[in-house]
Amino acid sequence: MKEYKLSEILTIKNGRDYKNLKNGLYPVYGSGGLMCTVDNYLYERPSVLLPRKGTLSNIQFADSPFWTVDTLYYTEIDNHLADPYYLYYYLKQLDLTQLNSGTGVPSMTFDSYYNIKVNLPNIHEQRAVGQFLSVLDDKIQLNKRINDNLRASRAQSQTQFELCRGAAVNADVSPNLLTLDRSSTKVKVRRAA
């Protein structure tokens, strides 16, 4: 393990206004998360996105071209010293609220970030851990999408059930609907009309 200040392993850059850009494929991130997509990007390499204003605990990661607004810094990381994904997870577990420099809205300055000390293993270990965590994150995202699809499917099935239940209540007007004959001790299936 070796101790570094963040200033030794990365450069912090300011986000910019995106309002003059058109809709497109590149995500725009703010301190609250994904905002929209635009037709241009600020940076194309993997980057840890650090909140400047707002929710200081919402450290994000971008691994494809992106744009950030002025409430979010992006980082240019020295890949010889730090694996971006490993560094993302390392910083994510820190409590940054103690470094808050704002009086009203929580805020962080370049210097607040640059003075953070991190203990990093050698780059090969970082890459192995970073890759493992990346695979886990991908699996978690896949599971979330599966759960969302299951919820949507359940809601659709529930709607269909409600429609069928309504048809069963009105079986006398639906001659092709099968119903139960409960007039005797044995239950028989009969046509509705």
Question: What residues fall within each predicted segment?
Answer:
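A short beta-sheet element
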Residues: 30-97, 101-105, 109-113
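Non-catalytic DNA-recognition/assembly elements of restriction-modification systems
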Residues: 1-30, 115-193
